[in-house]
Amino acid sequence: MTFIEKNTSFPAPRNDLVRATRPGKVDAYPQDWIHAAQELAQEFAQAAVQRDLEGARPVDQIRRLRESGFVSLLYPKNLGGGGGTLHDAAQSVLEIAKVDGSTAALLGFNYYNSLVPLLTDYTGANDAVVRHAADNRFFWGNVTQYVNKEFVAQHHPDGGYTITGTKKWNTGAPLAEITTLLAIHPDQDRYIYAVIPTAREGLEFHNDWDPIGLRGTDSGTITFHNVRIFPEEVLNWGHSPAQTGPLPLWASFGAIFYTAVFIGRTLGALEQVREWVLRGRRQGSFGGVSVSADDPFIQAEFAEYWVQVQ
């Protein structure tokens, strides 16, 4: 029995893969997030390339992110979170991206979306959602693309909404137990944000994501078939005027986490090249050297790449 099954009445996961991401234990939050991320990266490096070649989903890696508390890093301590900083979060994504781009991207999107209840209202009206997420170490999915203009909610006679439509590029949602949800209000003059379980009846996951290098991010298409959104699942919007565009700081946070993934992947690639060169020997002597690492042309080229990254 997992930690969540012992401590919550949250709906059962939609499949065995999602269930396998549930934490079997709950570690204390790290005192040094970046050092802890480096240790996790060493774990994740095992067979990361093979997982991507096979298109295997990073189930065990998400479970470890939940057990270690990284999924709740940005939540305040008084709400049960890790109390980490934005720098801690971005650097953790970067460290993991050096060895496992898919898992790093999923962690970045988790941070991106775990902040939604805090960004939609600064008065604490959504604190219960944050506490629930922190208590359960939830990994967050993402169903928030603004480009799907036909994704319009309809009023439900008992309150809340129903939604029928399709959303593309839903990073992490297939392996998450909860996800943010962005839809156009029935009046079509503003957006609504909600948080729903991915086991909700009417959700169809298409599993159509297959890009080289980031196959494990699970950013596929989801179709909603008359999916119910209950009133208590709709996040409070505490700003004026009504939400007609992206959340406050949304683009900035996205840029930070995307950049962390890109830089981490680049640093990881350079490290792999360095290791290959250090191990390599030439069949003959060129330019007076027989070891590749001693070749001044290779040294100059590597130095140029390194400077560009910096």
Description of each model-found segment:
Residues 49-52, 310:
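C-terminal helix-coil-helix/basic helical segment that borders enzyme active sites and/or dimer interfaces
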Residues 166-205:
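A short core secondary-structure module
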